Structure formats: C-alpha cells, structure tokens
Amino acid sequence: MATRIPGTVAASGVYYNDQYRMPCKLKGIHCMALNCIPQKAKVRKCMNGYQSTFRFCVNEKNGQTTGQSNGSLIQQGQNFRCHSYGSHNSSETKECSLEDGTDSYRDFEEHSRGASQFSDNQVAAKKKSVKSSQGLAEACKFVYNDAKFVNERAQNDILLLSRGITRLNKRACQDVAVLGSGFLKLDARARKDTKKIDHSVKERAARLTHFARILKEQAQSDLKKAADQHWSDGALEADLRRADSVVRRRAMEDAFMALKFVRDIHDMMANRLQEQFAKDGSSSPANSRSFITLEKNGNTFELFPHEVSTDQITAIEQAYWSMASALSEADGIDYTDPEELELLVATLIDLDAMDGKKSVSLLAECSSSPDVNTRKALANALAAAPSMWILGNAGMGALQRLAQDSNYAVARAATRAINELTKQWELEEGDSLRFVLNQNMVSKETADDSAAADDTR
C-alpha cells in the first residue's frame, strides 16, 4: 500500500504468514526522502492479528498535504519503506535504511506471541514509544542526509571547478603553442624572404656584369672591325701619309726659314768684310788669323768653333748691329711665336751677340712677356747656349728672372739651364783652366809661333 505526498511517496508493506495470516519479520526501514516524518500513528485490531496504521499529517496551513500510510504491527519487528522521488526544488533521489533491533515493537512482538490480545492502554503506550523513537531516528537520518548532500555538492563543485581550471590551463597551453608556432613560421618566412632577396640581388648583379662584359666585347669587336675596314679602304694609310706630309712640310718651312735667315746674315757679314778690306787696301783676310781655346784638365773646349780673326770679329759685330736694326724694324718676325723666338735667340747665340743693345731689350721684353709659351721658349733657347761666356750678362740675367717665374715649367727649365752652365765653371781640387790664343801666319816662310798660356787654379 502506498500513499503519495507532494514531493514524497511513502509505501509500507506487511508480509503475512500463509497459515495464520501473521506478519513475518522485516529487515528494517528503507526511506528515500529528506522530509519523511510520521506525525500520527493509529493501531487497528484485526481478526487474525494486529495491524497498525501510521498516518502522516502535515499542516495544510504551511502549504503541505496530509497523507496516510497503513502498516501492520508484527511480533518479530517492523518494516517501513519510504520512497521519495524528489521535492519541488530538487530532482535527486536519496535512499536511507534504518534497522533497529531493540525497538519497542520487539516487546510488542514477544507479547503478541504469549497472548492473543492487547489492551487499549498497552497499545497507546507502545504507540507513544514508537512515535518518539521514530522521530529521533528520522531527525538523525535527515541530518546525515543533509550533510551527505552538502558534502556531495561541495565535491561536485570542487570537481567542476578543477575541470574548469584544467580546461583553462589546456586552452592557455594551446594558445601559447599556437603563438609559438606562429612566431616560428614568421621567423622562417622572414629568413626565406631574406634569402630570396639576397639571391635575387646577386642574380641581378651577375646579370648586369654579364651584360656589361658583353657590351664591352661587342664595342671592342665593332671598333676593331671599323679599324680593319678603315685600313682596308686605305683611309687610315691616307691619314698617315697626310700627317707625315704635314710634318715634313712644317720641317721644311722651318729649315728654309733658318737657311734664309742665315743666308741674309752671311750676306750682310760678307758685305761688311768687303767694305772693311776696301778701306784698308793692304790688308787681306788671310793676313792674320787666330782662335781662342779653353782647356780644362787636358780637355779642350772651343769657345769659337772656327778660326776667327780680329777683323772678322769686328765685321761680325757691325753686321749684327745692322741685322738687329733690320729685325727690330721688320714686320716678318713675330716675337710672340715660340718657334721664331727660339730661332732668333739661337742665331744671336751663334753670333755671340747676346750683350748688344738690341739683344738686351729683346731678352728683357720676352722674359717679362705675359704669354707663358713665349717665356718657356726663351728659357729653352737660352738653355741651348754652350757656356755662360756666350750668354753674357744679358742672357744670364734673363735666365735668373725666368728661374723665379710663377709658372712651374718655365722656372724648372731656367733653373736646369743655370745649373748646367754653372757646372762648367765648378773647379774641384786638382782642376786647372787654361786659355790659349793661336796665331797662324799665311806666309810660307815663317814658322808657327806658340802663344803664352795662363794657368788658373
């Protein structure tokens, strides 16, 4: 027999003996509820035994419903089974069992074995005793069940919390692993891109170098082909012949000018000599001839390369004066032309006329010329002099001014000329200089006279 209470289902069963309809001994009370509390118990007397009815009454004012449960009092014990399938706020099912071997029903059972009937007073006393012991047992069961429920809920909460923390830890580890793999991928990608860029740059540089080499070889090949074609066509040979002819013509012009200049000077000197001999009458060019030589350490230096008489020297001087006057008034000679200036200075050196009035003015004007080529040509011409004796004071003064020139090439040429000329007069220990004047008479009867010599140390 079962009775349903809101949130609780209570069932009580009684097992009877088949022969005498007497209840057998039950093992105990099984209760599945948190609020299964008997409020009232009634005992009802039956024909063949004693059957007890327990009524559970709940105050309806508090929102509860009263239910009844019928049971049987047996001599060997009692058996109560309460089934709770959950309350309004919980769906959990709890089962509890209670077995009391020293219950008051045992006395009742033993008494039922000895006598067949109970008095009403005894039944009431037993009922009160059962009620009090059952309430205490139910209270203990409820406290135990509540503690057990709280413990289980706490364990479940801790388990859920632990699982949540574990999941968070796994998720964090996965995120860290994903980030690490991402960084590794980025690093590998960066290395790969760097290698690719480096490789591409090297390839481009090699390609440009190859192109430059090809272009250079092609240009050389084209130039060689053009030169070969030009040579095969005869143009290069014609150019060489033309250049050679230009050089030869310029050389011939220079030689012709020099020869013409020398011829004019020779004609002037011859005319002067003829005039001089015509005035003297008895004198002849072969009367007296002499030449001066310089000996240094046994080596002879000819100051005048040919035999020159006193009359010839005078004639040369007069011819030079006439020539210098003619050159200063002529328009055909340009002093600013380096080639003509060198030729003119060389002629003056050969005539030993560097100390003349016209020569001094010429050297002074050319040495202070603003044209660099003119000053350089004058320095080169003066450097060709055989000795300082030939240059004289005017020539050496011009060289000294040119040695201090602002132009490096001019100053270097003048300094080198001065050093070369100075070395001729440097006397070392054991050196000796001797000037010799030789006179030769043309007469066949006279013998040669030796001239006096001066030794200088």
UniProtKB/Swiss-Prot annotation:
Compartments where found: Plastid, Chloroplast
Keyword Plastid: yes
Any one cellular-component term (Gene Ontology): chloroplast
Transit peptide region: 1-57
Domain of life: Eukaryota
Tissue expression summary: Expressed in leaves (at protein level).
Signal peptide (from-to): none
Single GO BP term: leaf senescence
Keyword Glycoprotein: no
Keywords assigned: Chloroplast, Plastid, Transit peptide
UniProt family annotation: Belongs to the ATA15/OSA15 family.
Known role: May be involved in the regulation of leaf senescence.
Protein's recorded name: Senescence-associated protein OSA15, chloroplastic
Protein source organism: Oryza sativa subsp. japonica
GN (gene name): OSA15
